[in-house]
Amino acid sequence: MDALRKLGSLGRRRDEVDTASSPLKNEASAAEIPRDPVQISGKDEASPSGLTPIRVRVPEDVRSESEVKRDGDEESVGSGESFDSALERMEASSITSFEPPSPMESIDGRFQFEDGVREDLAESGLDGNFSYDDDDDDEEEEEDGSEEGESTSSSIINSEYSSSASNTEDEMDISGYGASSARTMLVSNDASKSDEEAIDEPKYKLRNVVTGEENMSGGLSVENEARGVALSSWKSELEDFYEASLEDNDVQEELAEKIIKVASEQNDEEDEEVHFPVIANELPGRITRNRTMIDSPAHLYSAVKAVDSTLPALKSESTKSITQGFVEAEEAESDVFTEGEDGYDDEDEDGDIQMDVSQATEKSGTPDESESNPSMGAGGPRLPSLPQRSSARRSAATTATGVPRPNTASSTQSAATSDASISSESSEANEIREKLQNIRIKFLRLARRLNQSPQNVVVAQVLYRLGLAESLRGGSSLNRTRAFSFDHANALAEEQEAAKYEDLDFACTILVLGKTGVGKSATINSIFDECKTVTSAYYPSTTKVHEVSGTVLGVKVRFIDTPGLLPSTADQRHNKNIMRQVKKYIKKVSPDIVLYFDRMDMQTRDSGDVPLLRTITDVFGAAVWFNATVVLTHASKAPPDGSNGTPMSYDYFVAQRSHFVQQTIRQAAGDARLQNPVSLVENHPACRINRSGQRVLPNGQPWKQQLLLLCFASKILAEANTLLKLQEASTPGKPFGQRSRVPPLPYLLSSLLQSRAQLKMPDEQHGESEDSDDDSDEEDEEEGDEYDDLPPFRPLSKQELEDLSKEQRQEYAEELADRERLFQKKQYREQIRRRRERKKQASVMSKEEPSIPGDGAEDESGQPATVAVPMPDMALPPSFDSDNPTHRYRYLETANQWLVRPVLETHGWDHDAGYDGFNVEKMFVVKEKIPASVSGQVTKDKKEAQVNFEAAASLRHGEGKVTLTGFDVQTIGKDLAYTVRAETRFNNFKRNKTTAGVTATYLNDTIAAGVKLEDRVLIGKRVKLVVNGGVLTGKGDKAYGGSLEATLRGKEYPLSRTLSTLGLSVMDWHGDLAIGGNLQSQFMVGKTMMVGRANLNNRGSGQVSIRASSSEQLQMVLIGIVPILRSLINCRFGFGGQPQQ
């Protein structure tokens, strides 16, 4: 280090002698410029290196002198830059400060700095030929310029570049910056040499102290007239020579001779003639450079910092520290611009980055000063803007030696292509990027107000998600300036907070839900630090939905306070009424986030809150939990004892309670992926307070700031999602939006296993049911008609009935009921007999004259269509309305074969006009032997539309063989499912029918296919057994299912209407076995029809219902008094409802 300082002092003394004698220098000598003494302040505590920053006071009289000589400097220096030009850049401020990097220690010839390793002068070597400005030799060089040719002219041009900045440094005490001064010597102007040439000729390439031409625009390498002095052998020899001769007064002359000697020997070995320029004796004196000259160690450091971000930042009055967490991103951005140096002419990209850099330097310099010197301003050294570096490189390449750079045409073409591609970007992308940056600034301002640093987990996660969403939405075009986005946003957030504290366009609306007595209203009061709502520890204080608004830290916050909910299963009706009020209220004011409140000290291991959470899910939908935060009050409660009898830790207690609440929400929402954030709250007046006056939890964290940060972060992410339109713009191939889902196999399998009736011809549609043919041949003809065997019967008049006794009247009624039953049975048998005869006649006629049955059927089917008859009234539910509009649902059948009817919502509130869709049906015959039907229904409410369409046709192809085909369209969720099915039924035996079918469903770009097999067996006259099974597969998934149904009919069915059915169903999907059983029975008790139903599954859930209908037992109406009395008792005493206040 001492040797380098001596070397610098030798160069300064030599400069003082040569300054006046140089004929090429048109600038004023540094000694002629009056200067104030150098002021050295005390040690800067913020400086990481601990060095004393140097402040140079520039007097006002220097400015006028420099302005006079500026024009002359530009003419004489050419592309160089004088000391007076540097003074002009410092006019905006009278004090310029800089702090060069300080070497901490030397390791293997390298100086170790705080943020990296910089090569020492001895190890770096010399990167080509040095051009020394010796006065005598310069005159000889001008005389022999015509003989030297191109190489000599290049040397003369470079020798004209004077460095008055070196003389400026001579007047200062910069002995402590020997390393940096030495690095300044190695700056050159080899702009005409490309990177490819440097790689192809490694033996001629010298390593520079700074990154060199590969990393610095315009190049920092030495001239290329003596390229062959770059071998490690003479570098080590040169290093030894430096160390041995630094203390010698003639070290520079010997050094110059040594350079010439070593270079000559090396070129002699290569048989290459090299023309050396005139080498002056002052090695550390003036140095020829290109237009981007560096005047001092601090300036050199600023230029190197532009391409190497690992250097420690300079401490100046206009420089702000960069957040530690984003240093790596800045380094990555620097590498991006370094790698694309050769063809980097993208003005749009440079403009984006220059915008961030220029905004960061507005305070310290004017625009004109920044343009004149990108690396120097009134406030001290700064990073040069990259677009000006590119222009400097191009100007140096065209003015150096006239040798064209390789691949110039291709580079220009690629640059033009790049410019065209960037210019083709729509203005919408730039607008989105600007708005997203404003969102970042807004969030950083909110975080500052909440005293949260960018290293906070929530803040960092939100910023990461914003960057990720921006990348997914805009691709690489929006990702180029990612390294500058945070620094720029953070600086603007700090400036806006300092200038306009109240000017923050942000408001948050929060919906509060939770059980009664958990502290919802108390939390609202704690957040506003004032009593906004009335609270009570003994009874619920909030009786209706209302809004509480105020300002917290300059942010408008609005709470929607709701009455407390009750956790009991019997109170869910009360909860539904409250949530319907909330749902009606939020239609006017939409909330940004939902807070679900619960108590921290509620130790419940059961699923008692599941009914409450499911009620919330049913009313608001499962999406209510996607933007919800769990708030646990009474967070200062001491943890209970663990299983071993010792109190558990506070963190473990919080994690255990949070996990239980989150698991309950997942169970109620039906989504195992939910992970709602949890925030802790303590509203007790005796809560601990820190030095800042904030209420803190037992773990020392202020809960108010954390809760507000979660709410604000959710609102910020929602704004970004709305701006970027991720869900709308996403496709199934992208991470967001609709993805290809597995079809609902259990639902489709249940539809496949369902038995469907075969279509019949119009003349065959007189049977009672599909099973009427099964027992038509089994009627006992030998029994005859019992009604005909009865003795004659004379009905009695009313007077005669009054004369009879009670027993006689009862016997008369029984006799009359038996005769009525036998008469109905006789009519039923005659109907079956006629149908059998008609079938036989149709089969015979089809064999003899195929055309006659068709014509007859056509006439018979067309005759009733020509007469308009009233249709039967629709079955309406019982209603106590005085104006029940039954007349609205009576229609007339027209001659048109299409039947169109409205669809009535029987359970809707609108009894006057409760239409929500229409139904279309039509039956027709294809080719006189294939019956077909088409039906469809469309329903629409305010939110959803349902579409159901079905087309079916039956084809008979032999005795007892029928094939049914169909096409269905139905709405499943938000998608349409298209199903094609076909099944064939054939008779194996007289009492056995077998059905086999296939189906295929197309849903959401997925096809699900399945098969089924069904067998129907009749056992005697009263028992029917149906067994079916099937499998459905789609997208690698499978579902298996089957069912068994046994039916027992009464002796006189269908006259007696006695029927009992036992069913069992099994389904296996994803290894989850679902078993269900159901039982249904109906029978007559006198003239009262009794119907009982019961079902149970393997998960323990079931249902039992009993229904009785009678036209004689009017006392059954008294059963309706029971629910009326229960409602009155609940309203009076509060059982099952809201407690009375």
Curated annotation (Swiss-Prot):
Transmembrane segments annotated in the record for this chain: 1116-1136
Binding site for Mg(2+): 521
GO terms assigned for molecular function: GTP binding; GTPase activity; metal ion binding
Region annotation G3: where it falls in the sequence: 561-564
PROSITE patterns on file: G_AIG1
Spans annotated as G2: 541-545
Segments of skewed composition (Acidic residues): 132-150, 328-353, 770-789
Start and end residues of each stretch annotated as Disordered: 1-177, 325-431, 758-795, 832-871
Biased composition (Basic residues): 832-841
Cofactor(s) needed: Mg(2+)
Cofactor note: Binds 1 Mg(2+) ion by subunit.
Annotated AIG1-type G domain residues: 505-734
Biased composition (Low complexity): 151-167, 389-401, 408-429
Record keywords: Chloroplast, GTP-binding, Hydrolase, Magnesium, Membrane, Metal-binding, Nucleotide-binding, Plastid, Plastid outer membrane, Protein transport, Transmembrane, Transmembrane helix, Transport
Biological-process GO terms, alphabetical: protein import into chloroplast stroma; protein targeting to chloroplast
Protein localization: Plastid, Chloroplast outer membrane
Chain intervals with Basic and acidic residues compositional bias: 57-72, 107-121
Enzyme nomenclature, EC number: 3.6.5.-
Subunit structure: Part of the TOC core complex.
Biological role stated in the UniProt entry: GTPase involved in protein precursor import into chloroplasts. Seems to recognize chloroplast-destined precursor proteins and regulate their presentation to the translocation channel through GTP hydrolysis. Probably specialized in the import of nuclear encoded non-photosynthetic preproteins from the cytoplasm to the chloroplast.
NCBIfam families: 3a0901s04IAP86
Protein name: Translocase of chloroplast 125, chloroplastic
Organism: Physcomitrium patens (Spreading-leaved earth moss)
Gene: TOC125
